[in-house]
Amino acid sequence: MVSMFSLFLLLIEQSPLVASLQQSQRHIVGVPWEKQHLYDSNEPDLTKWHCLNHEDIVLDISQINDGVCDCPDGSDEPGSAACVEDIFKSVAEGGGKVNKYFYCDNKGFIPRYIRKSEVADGICDCCDCSDELLSGYELFDAGSNCSQLKNEFDIMASKELSSYREGKEALEELERKYGTKEEAITRGNCLEEDKEKASAEIKVLSNRLSENRAKLEQLRGEYFNQLSHDPILYQFEQLNSTRLGSDILTSFTMVSRVSKGYQDIFKILSDLSEAYTPSLNDKVVNDNIKKFRKVRRRAEKAKINADSKIDDEQADNLYLYFTEEVPQIFLKRESENTLRYVIGKSNFVQALVEGKINYTNDILEYIREFRLIMDDISQNYNVNFQDAGVKSAVDSYKNYLGEYGELAELEPAHPSESLLRSLSEVTSFVNENAPKVLPPDAVESEQDTNSDHIGTSGDLRNKLKEILSKLNIFSSRKDLVSLEKRFRSCESQVSLLENELKQKMDYKKLLDETEDEGTNSTAGNLTELLELMGSQSYCLDDILDNYVYTICFQRPMTEGVIYQAEDKVDGKKVLIGRFKTSGFNVDLNMEKYAEHLKATYDEKSDLISNLAAIQDDDGNMQHYVFGNLNELNNGLVLEYENGDQCWNGPRRSATVFVRCSDKFKIRSVHEATKCNYIFDVVGPLGCNKTFEYEPPKFNLSE
């Protein structure tokens, strides 16, 4: 902490008693040493000074930093908050610039720029407290002094560099294990061999695909030709109930997610309502708990019952209904259930699908109300009360936002017109045609038998013809079932070959791009290493927030995948994406490294906040004055796309950022935009082998 004696000395320097001394020394607070000359007298009268952008406005030199904004460009107040930031303009003179930011000299630590809005607010944002010298306020937060921060920085840098060395050694070990070649000639030869092999595989796959497509067209013609002899089955094929089942499964995936989102935030607030301490009289918390209890009572009266497990079971059952149960009725002319049950279930399924999706809107409204309550608590609760129940709820809510952030942006869900139309068509078809292909129920059959009197030889002949006709249809249908199986099998084979061919072609393209980048590049080295690791199907997985995330490298790289699975027996598994490309992102590297430092060191001190700076020529970007520590990471980014379809949204995709460490681990996963995930991973692949530490420029002058 800054000592009271030091503060006294700093403040007394600005008092009227030493004003003349300050003028002779001419050190202007808030201005770096190389720009101090801009505040020397620029008038014949050495007691005068004119505004840097307005030579016609002449002031007494004592008016600089006097707390009154006299210059239109704000140049007379570099060390106070008197001028509104928007009026400042950069002034070029003698190759230097003056702009709208306050310069912290920070003797003993690292100089930096801060915003004028942070000046004279009673809080020392500069470790030398120079931003509060002219405020006249009593300080209520002096923070760490520059000497303390220097010691903390040295410790932090030592830990980061030690971790980097371990990561670099682990990377070199991976290269030895998987046999990467540093020699450009060897790598070039290997690359050429891989390209030739990939080209040969593409040729073989293309030929196989052409043959299978021709076979598929032949089977398709035979199948639909035979279908034309069975009008009911032909009509059913046009409905495409399998596609409908997939669409409903996709819709119910979001229904389940909304239910889980409701359950989780309801639990956070329920636990908080039991664990918080009312006697602390935190008005924000007490008022919001009352709101929660009112909303909870309203939800109970409305009989809101969100259960993601039930939603998942219903989704699976509906998928089986449309892809297996209904097709069996018309293809095999059989059902395990009575005709009455078949028709009743068809109508029930339609009502369930329509009602469930609409019911989700009610749940979303309650989620939004609960989130407003937790937003207010998280942002405005009194941290000084140290209420363990509140702190636990706020932490849980932060994790909740990371997992369910997109729910706040969801519009009211409505079944699509195409889904409703398909659902209605299948329901009507079942109701109309199931009685034509299934035997009547037992009671109805008995009534028909009692009322049917076969009294003539003509009646007997007619019955015999009907039986023989059914036998012929059965024999024909048996052939149709066999043909349908062969047709579907060939259709699947063509789809698999198309995917395999695309992956091989993408791999060949990646090899071509790697050759263009140059065999000595870091990208080339890592691409080769990823390929070699993929040849042994290298996977890493971790459990986060009740989900198992798995990232697998394959050879070729385009076969690499990311999966998300529920952490339970028979948990639902979804494909997040397939490997698309790799590269390096400098901006993301800086952002992720800053996040890492905050998460690792912020709770222990205010060091990281004292490393954040505004660059004097670019106030729109956050910069950090920790030297080039961020460059110990190479900024490796892996992109994945074409995952499973999100309900009412795009296909899933992901960006994987890899930070340097000696061991692989998935540290966090969050949804940046709808169905697009950011994976923060640590491991040797994120280490920059060519990194050499360049420390920041400390102000250690005596």
Swiss-Prot record:
Alphabetical keyword list: Coiled coil, Disulfide bond, Endoplasmic reticulum, Glycoprotein, Signal
Signal peptide location: 1-20
Coiled-coil annotated residue ranges, if any: 163-228, 478-517
Localization terms from the record: Endoplasmic reticulum
Kinase among keywords: no
One Pfam assignment: PRKCSH-like
Name listed for the protein in its UniProt record: Glucosidase 2 subunit beta
Residues of the MRH domain: 537-689
Note: Present with 9760 molecules/cell in log phase SD medium.
Residues listed as glycosylation sites in the UniProt record: N145, N240, N358, N520, N525, N688, N699
Biological role: Subunit of glucosidase 2, which cleaves sequentially the 2 innermost alpha-1,3-linked glucose residues from the Glc(2)Man(9)GlcNAc(2) oligosaccharide precursor of immature glycoproteins. Specifically required for the cleavage of the final glucose.
Taxonomic lineage of the native organism: Eukaryota, Fungi, Dikarya, Ascomycota, Saccharomycotina
InterPro entries: Gtb1-like (IPR039794), Man6P_isomerase_rcpt-bd_dom_sf (IPR009011), MRH_dom (IPR044865), PRKCSH (IPR036607), PRKCSH_N (IPR028146)
Tagged with keyword Disulfide bond: yes
Oligomeric and partner information: Heterodimer of a catalytic subunit alpha (ROT2) and a subunit beta (GTB1).
GO biological process: fungal-type cell wall beta-glucan biosynthetic process; N-glycan processing; polysaccharide biosynthetic process
